[in-house]
A protein has these predicted regions:
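Short loop/turn segments that connect beta-strands within beta-propeller blades
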Residues: 48-52, 85-89, 127-131, 169-173, ...
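Beta-rich, blade/repeat-based domains predominating
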Residues: 20-33, 60-70, 98-110, 140-150, ...
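Conserved beta-strand positions in repeat-built beta-propeller and related beta-rich domains
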Residues: 37-42, 73-79, 115-120, 155-160, ...
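Blade/loop signatures of beta-propeller domains
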Residues: 1-12
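Blade-level signature of beta-propeller repeat domains, shared across WD40, Kelch, NHL, RCC1
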Residues: 187-221
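Loop/turn-rich, solvent-exposed surfaces of beta-rich toroidal or solenoidal domains
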Residues: 143-164
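A short beta-strand motif characteristic of beta-propeller blades
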Residues: 12-20, 52-58, 90-96, 132-137, ...
Length: 221
């Protein structure tokens, strides 16, 4: 891959949420079909994307990515990934995180977890039961949040004051689309609502930003 392979277009920020009470940072972000979940360090917060109101709070550590498999939450916490019952907040199982504390984003797709490696500039597909690495995708940027939507793999980047949303090929890692965030609007966590929005964690801003997802298109060859 080269830096000039795909030119970026400006990301369209539709709405901002937060900061939330008692939370000065947002790490991972996921969407359960109704609520947006944000990992804020000591707690997981679920909020209504229509009203912006906080609906649930779980006392669970979350210092990086968050994912949802349709039933359970998965949360990067230090050097592990916790499988959490969102109804009770109980941790049902834990596996070692592949980066041993250096992990960033987290997503669920194809029956597996996809884990962003920030400084290693990689995305790993891992077995959700064992943590075994099934696939490695190389990036040429620091990787933050990771999201899968309609078969498309997207990840956030964060270098200095610049962040992008990138659509990449799941086999080669080639960059297919780039959405550039305004300077200073950085991306930590990332998740799609399954429709036309991405929810982007804003790191130390304590905010979550809704960004317009581009219409799905056939990748150019």
């Amino acid at each position: 891959m080269t830096r000039n392979e795909t030119k970026p277009t400006a990301a369209e920020i539709v709405r901002e949420y937060g900061p939330f009470p008692g939370a000065d940072k947002v790490h991972g972000v996921t969407h359960d079909g109704r609520h947006v979940w944000a990992a804020t360090g000591a707690k997981l917060i679920a909020f209504d994307p229509e009203s912006g109101d906080v609906a649930r709070t779980l006392d669970r550590t979350g210092d990086a990515g968050t994912a949802f498999d349709g039933t359970h939450l998965y949360q990067l916490a230090e050097a592990r990934i916790d499988k959490i019952d969102p109804k009770t907040g109980n941790v049902l199982a834990s596996i070692p995180a592949p980066g041993q504390g250096r992990d960033s984003g987290l997503a669920w797709a194809e029956g597996a977890l996809w884990v962003g490696q920030y400084r290693d500039r990689k995305i790993l597909k891992i077995d959700p039961s064992t943590g075994a690495v099934l696939r490695t995708i190389e990036s040429n940027r620091f990787v933050t949040g990771v999201s899968f939507v309609d078969g498309e793999l997207w990840h956030g980047t964060w270098e200095g004051d610049e962040s992008e949303l990138r659509h990449v090929d799941t086999e080669s890692g080639a960059v297919l689309e780039r959405l550039a965030m305004p300077t200073g609007k950085n991306i930590s966590g990332l998740e799609s609502d399954g429709a036309d929005l991405f929810y982007c964690g804003g790191g130390p801003s304590g905010k979550v930003r809704a960004v317009r997802r581009p219409a799905k298109r056939t990748a150019q060859r």
